[in-house]
């Protein structure tokens, strides 16, 4: 299911970040902060009235030719473009300014639902001025106070009322859906084109559930694939690539719809901090992952160099020790033949089910090899385990006391399950539960 997106927009100093933090911290329950961007507090994944959605905090929209103002305006325009609903925030202590009118013109052009929030209405007497905000032309304005958290419930009720129909995407169970993520200029579009040119069996370009997204069908090795949101890579181009904070949103949407995520790394420039953040999105979403080192033609690409590079990847991406690493060049097509088998293997692992009796044989053998830990004289007893979900494979281990399950022992059991059943390219989730 695609999450709706809410952008908070307005001129500088109307309290956008205060409202964002108030919504994130108190008035709505945060499901999780989207990983890797917590420093900037640009995005949050949130829930209100059983609707899960993304909130975006934008920079202030301000006229001017200074590079910083142009960049902030450009970023806000991208957020508006991605949003399903826009919260237009104003400063109730200052009334409607000419700068607010300029923002309103921009929002009218978007043809998106706009909900007006008049911030800094800290006492009821100020509410008498609320009617002047009808003149903006967006319907009922909502008096709110970011400082005191007043009026936000009514505002959010209105916001979620504008969300598009959250119907489940119909996916063909026999088709593998995959996306490509990576920092700018890592070669995402080149790799898509290499896959398509090599195959030359594009059935059709199909509309994705995400607005403006084009998905591309592909058939290879007796398997149907869908490459998710190729439009995001092939059409949006430099504006999205240059404003990384906001282009991340499209990657998050693609990840949500994927079975397998290809995390692209540039062999020429090596591993960067941004690579880790991007990979973290896919890992935290529980998707199958293949690490793809592109531009392998630009470096000393012998077997020894490959092993050294993979060793470096393992050191930087310790939480992705399950992900296979594929080395290739989209430009020269070198080693392209290794990619599709890796995607298929990761997808198979992601959907694999293990019979309960076979699983418990492995668990009991593992315990015999490495006895369960004790805490304050009390020993952990593992009674039995069962698989409860796929995508990713998830297991519940029933025990006498979950508090006795140390992280290191949980990781030991997880690794034994992974090794025994060949889970490659997928995270595994293990939960200790007290037997009722």
Curated annotation (Swiss-Prot):
Is GTP-binding one of the keywords UniProt gives this record?
yes
Q: What Gene Ontology molecular-function terms does this entry list?
A: GTP binding; ribosome binding
Q: What is this protein called?
A: GTPase Der
Tell me what gene encodes this.
Answer: der
Ranges for domain KH-like: 352-436
| Described purpose of this protein according to its UniProt entry | GTPase that plays an essential role in the late steps of ribosome biogenesis.
Q: Name one matching Pfam family.
A: KH_dom-like
Q: Which PROSITE patterns match?
A: G_ENGA
Subunit organization: Associates with the 50S ribosomal subunit.
Q: Which residues bind GTP 2?
A: 182-189, 229-233, 294-297
User: Which family is it part of?
Assistant: Belongs to the TRAFAC class TrmE-Era-EngA-EngB-Septin-like GTPase superfamily. EngA (Der) GTPase family.
Record-annotated residues binding GTP 1?
10-17, 57-61, 119-122
- Origin species: Oceanobacillus iheyensis (strain DSM 14371 / CIP 107618 / JCM 11309 / KCTC 3954 / HTE831)
Keywords in alphabetical order, please. Answer: GTP-binding, Nucleotide-binding, Repeat, Ribosome biogenesis
* Example GO BP: ribosome biogenesis
Residues in domain EngA-type G?
A: 4-167, 176-351
Source domain of life is: Bacteria
Give the Gene3D superfamilies listed for this entry: 3.30.300.20, P-loop containing nucleotide triphosphate hydrolases
């Amino acid at each position: 299911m695609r999450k709706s997106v809410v952008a908070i927009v307005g001129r500088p100093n109307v309290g956008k970040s205060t409202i964002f933090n108030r919504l994130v911290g108190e008035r709505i329950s945060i499901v999780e902060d989207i990983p890797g961007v917590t420093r900037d507090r640009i995005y949050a994944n949130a829930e209100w009235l059983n609707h899960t959605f993304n909130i975006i905090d934008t920079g202030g929209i301000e006229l001017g030719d200074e590079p910083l103002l142009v960049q902030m305006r450009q970023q806000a325009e991208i957020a508006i473009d991605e949003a399903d609903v826009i919260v237009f925030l104003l400063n109730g202590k200052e009334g409607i300014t000419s700068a607010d009118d300029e923002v309103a013109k921009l929002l009218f052009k978007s043809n998106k639902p706009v909900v007006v929030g008049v911030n800094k209405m800290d006492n009821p007497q100020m509410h008498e001025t609320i009617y002047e905000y009808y003149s903006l032309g967006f319907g009922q304005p909502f008096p709110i106070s970011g400082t005191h958290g007043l009026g936000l419930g009514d505002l959010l009720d209105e916001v979620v009322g504008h969300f598009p129909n959250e119907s489940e995407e119909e996916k063909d169970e026999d088709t593998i859906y995959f996306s490509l993520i990576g920092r700018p200029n890592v070669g995402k579009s080149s790799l898509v084109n290499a896959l398509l040119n090599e195959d030359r069996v594009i059935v059709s370009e199909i509309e994705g559930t995400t607005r403006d997204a084009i998905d591309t069908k592909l058939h290879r090795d007796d398997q149907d694939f869908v490459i998710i949101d190729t439009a995001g890579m092939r059409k949006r181009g430099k504006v999205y690539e240059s404003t990384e904070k906001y282009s991340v949103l499209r990657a998050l949407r693609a990840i949500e719809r994927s079975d397998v995520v290809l995390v692209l790394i540039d062999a020429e420039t090596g591993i960067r901090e941004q690579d880790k953040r991007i990979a973290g999105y896919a890992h935290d979403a529980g998707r199958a992952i293949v690490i793809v080192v592109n531009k392998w033609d630009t470096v000393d690409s012998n077997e020894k160099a490959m092993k050294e590079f993979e060793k470096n990847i393992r050191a930087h991406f310790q939480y992705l020790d399950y992900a296979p690493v594929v080395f290739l060049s989209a430009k020269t097509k070198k080693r392209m033949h290794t990619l599709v088998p890796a995607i298929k293997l990761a997808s198979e692992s992601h959907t694999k089910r293990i019979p309960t009796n076979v699983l418990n044989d492995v668990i009991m053998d593992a315990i015999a090899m490495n006895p369960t830990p004790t805490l304050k004289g009390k020993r952990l007893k593992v009674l039995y385990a069962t698989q409860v979900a796929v995508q990713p494979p998830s297991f519940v281990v029933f025990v006498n006391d979950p508090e006795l399950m140390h992280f290191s022992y949980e990781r030991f059991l997880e690794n034994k399950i992974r090794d025994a059943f060949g889970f490659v390219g997928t995270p595994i989730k293990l939960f200790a539960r007290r037997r009722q």
